[in-house]
Amino acid sequence: MTELIKKGSGAKEASQFLAQATTKHKNAALLNLSNDLLIHTATLLQENEKDILRAQQKGTPETMIDRLRLTEERIKEISEAVKQVVALKDPIGEVTNMWKNEAELTIGKTRVPLGVIGIIYESRPNVTVDASVLCFKTGNAVILRGGSDAIDSNKALMSVIQDSLEASGFPRSSVQLIEDTSRETARDMMRLNRFLDVLIPRGGARLIQTVLENATVPVIETGTGNCHIYVDKAAEKQMAIDILVNAKCSRPSVCNAAETLLIHRDVAEDYLPAMETALKEYDVELRADERAKGILQEAKAATESDWEDEFLDFILAIKVVDSAEEAIDHINKYGTKHSEAIISNDYATGQAFHQKVDAAAVYINASTRFTDGFAMGFGAEIGISTQKLHARGPMGLTELTSTKYIIFGDGQIRN
């Protein structure tokens, strides 16, 4: 708790400095950080290797180790991502609306930082940089608590970040890492209302549920991604195959990867064998309902938990449905309100799907893999919010701000 109090106090003080920082000063610091990450590549890889070896010794699946791994190319990508944030418009100070009321008061609404943001996340060291940079750009101080699997990588990255920001004239406490990865410290952080203005969890269902159950700090939920592809009877066969393979296989360990295929009965016998062939190239394990299992050559029987799970692996659940309505009902029952897709050339069916499916992002004839700040065209994001208050979908710079009203008068009093 001592570490939390010390770093919380430092973050609160730094947030006052950051709120007043100019865009020019912040951008200059971020450009320096981008360069410093490249300069320290060898050290970062050396520390990351400690985490990789520890994960391998524990028998961690390779798809999860991939989330943990840093390479020279990935560090270059992280460095470039910092530059891309520099290029993004700074929302702080933006006047979103201004008007005069009946009392001749001029009322303005402007964007301001949230204050101090706490982020609890799992074994993805790139999040350490992404979260730091996004919070910094928006004038927020941030306290990070990463998973124990990535502790050596995170400590090395934090050292580079803090040294770089300090050299640019910013407090080291602008960005901080909680090095104690115990569950007790994580729970204490969830109740750090004295210093934290908001808490953002990034990780699997268990982590997010733990935060929701224990936090007294306001939470923005970045949900798990039990994403579905529904192939309608009016779907083009090759398009459906291409989208399914991309959504499932391009990077199965991320939250916007597809986990379940729903397919209309009218095209199941024709489409499923070709889909199985395409998925076999990636050694995807298929878990199918009775009707789909009768069509596929190699598939295990799906259980109830298979409809609920976010596999984050080369595993796909498959169900044959009688109608688009059944597909929608299934998604709304088992989905996590993240990203859902329909493949159909029938306009009315596509419209009904996007109107009835409850999700942050709904796709018509496109892969769910596009639920990402950069892919959507507004830059880096802190996570994908699956709740409806404050932010929903990819959370970019604007979603890390609040608003303040500024009222100009010339002596008015209220009668």
From Swiss-Prot:
Under which main EC class is this enzyme filed?
oxidoreductase
Q: Name one GO biological process term.
A: L-proline biosynthetic process
CDD domains in the record: ALDH_F18-19_ProA-GPR
Principal localisation: cytoplasm
One Gene Ontology cellular component: cytoplasm
Keyword Iron assigned to the entry: answer is no
Q: Give the UniProt keywords, A-Z.
A: Amino-acid biosynthesis, Cytoplasm, NADP, Oxidoreductase, Proline biosynthesis
Annotated GO molecular function terms are:
glutamate-5-semialdehyde dehydrogenase activity; NADP binding
Q: Which chain regions cross the lipid bilayer? A: none
Its Enzyme Commission number(s) read: 1.2.1.41
Q: Which reaction does it catalyse?
A: L-glutamate 5-semialdehyde + phosphate + NADP(+) = L-glutamyl 5-phosphate + NADPH + H(+)
What InterPro entries does UniProt report for this protein, alphabetically? Ald_DH/histidinol_DH, Ald_DH_C, Ald_DH_N, Aldehyde_DH_dom, G-glutamylP_reductase_CS, Glu-5-SA_DH, GPR_dom
> Where in the cell is the protein located?
Cytoplasm
Pathway it belongs to?
Answer: Amino-acid biosynthesis; L-proline biosynthesis; L-glutamate 5-semialdehyde from L-glutamate: step 2/2
Q: What does this protein do?
A: Catalyzes the NADPH-dependent reduction of L-glutamate 5-phosphate into L-glutamate 5-semialdehyde and phosphate. The product spontaneously undergoes cyclization to form 1-pyrroline-5-carboxylate.
Give the record's family classification: Belongs to the gamma-glutamyl phosphate reductase family.
Q: What is this protein called?
A: Gamma-glutamyl phosphate reductase
Its source organism is Listeria monocytogenes serotype 4b (strain F2365)
Q: What is the gene called? A: proA
